[in-house]
Amino acid sequence: MFLDTAKIKVKAGNGGDGMVAFRREKYVPNGGPWGGDGGRGGNVVFVVDEGLRTLMDFRYNRHFKADSGEKGMTKGMHGRGAEDLRVRVPQGTTVRDAETGKVLTDLIEHGQEFIVAHGGRGGRGNIRFATPKNPAPEISENGEPGQERELQLELKILADVGLVGFPSVGKSTLLSVITSAKPKIGAYHFTTIVPNLGMVRTQSGESFAVADLPGLIEGASQGVGLGTQFLRHIERTRVILHIIDMSASEGRDPYEDYLAINKELESYNLRLMERPQIIVANKMDMPESQENLEEFKKKLSENYDEFEELPAIFPISGLTKQGLATLLDATAELLDKTPEFLLYDESDMEEEAYYGFDEEEKAFEISRDDDATWVLSGEKLMKLFNMTNFDRDESVMKFARQLRGMGVDEALRARGAKDGDLVRIGKFEFEFVD
């Protein structure tokens, strides 16, 4: 089964908790703190594997969770960092943040790696908090929570050339005779319901990848027929071979077919029309094909002002192999002078994929529940909260100082908080002391 979209959830590992411990040895008075740091949580890493062809592996396995780091240990020893969770994806996978829609990365090279969720850092042990004023601190940090996010995956097959056209114009037949691919071929519409990929080698020794894409019909860009299900695969191609049935065996006008398909490509993505097209006049072995071709050329030339450049037309027959060598040589030549097309605007991409906090974002936010409880939230505040060890009084006092330093106390007073009011952070509640 060919699967080219998937929505998954990834969770990086939490950092290990830091430890509170003291050196207790004979003949070592005032041994001091000896608790080590926790280990780093594992990242979730996507790795491109050229052996994969679809996103089928994500159909039944939609949750990926990396291991957490080990806790800090006595004698100042750090906990072991967790191994990264490496997830294999096929070439041509685009990764988006499902919440924002931003493109995180476009994975196109074999072996390429990208961290989609960063593991949390380990919490600090009490060795890190020793000062001249407090040489034996009973303070440690919990490990930082690992990044958690929902991702939308899209597979756009890697092909230099895309074959487009109405159903049953001979795309699959053409692919089968110019490559070793074995697409399903039949005398009915939508015989091809998944993209097929093959490699072409010309007589001069040049090679390129060709994709046979399921047939388009009018309204495909609005979801008619197979809809936009496979239009995305055209986006990676550099050259489009527009296959026209010159025999008009389906009772349609070849020139109207040509205009209709171009309209669907343009409606789906304006940038698709920037790709150079070669018109492939197929089924020239059939009666009336030559007459239809002459009429097609006439209509095309009469309306050439509508096109930036008049496309080349190559008469062929996929059945008899007439004209194939000339077509393939011309395609290879056009590929040589056609650069890669940018798939996404910079505005679509995240400037940098990282796990941190935006300096421009508020450090905290204050709201009030229906029960009159003040609620504190915010990414930075929650990070401090999650890393606080509430089993240790000194850690709690440190957290209170951090809140005061962030201006939380002052902000609560400004909002009207009074002595004894309940304040909630996550599931933790405490009284406000003015």
Swiss-Prot record:
Task: Give one Pfam family, short name only.
Answer: GTP1_OBG
Q: What is its EC number?
A: 3.6.5.-
The GO cellular component terms are:
cytoplasm
Ranges where the OCT domain occurs:
356-434
Q: Which InterPro entries match?
A: G_OBG, GTP-bd, GTP-bd_Obg/CgtA, GTP-bd_prot_GTP1/OBG_C_sf, GTP1-OBG_CS, GTP1_OBG_dom, GTP1_OBG_dom_sf, OBG_GTPase
Among the GO molecular function terms of this UniProt record, one is: GTP binding
Q: What is its main location?
A: cytoplasm
Localization, UniProt: Cytoplasm
| Superkingdom classification of source | Bacteria
* Assembly behavior: Monomer.
Its function, per the record, reads: An essential GTPase which binds GTP, GDP and possibly (p)ppGpp with moderate affinity, with high nucleotide exchange rates and a fairly low GTP hydrolysis rate. Plays a role in control of the cell cycle, stress response, ribosome biogenesis and in those bacteria that undergo differentiation, in morphogenesis control.
Family that this chain belongs to: Belongs to the TRAFAC class OBG-HflX-like GTPase superfamily. OBG GTPase family.
Cite the PANTHER family for this sequence.
Answer: DEVELOPMENTALLY REGULATED GTP-BINDING PROTEIN-RELATED, MITOCHONDRIAL RIBOSOME-ASSOCIATED GTPASE 2
Task: Supply the name of the protein.
Answer: GTPase Obg
Q: Which organism is it from?
A: Streptococcus pneumoniae (strain ATCC 700669 / Spain 23F-1)
The record lists the lineage as: Bacteria, Bacillati, Bacillota, Bacilli, Lactobacillales
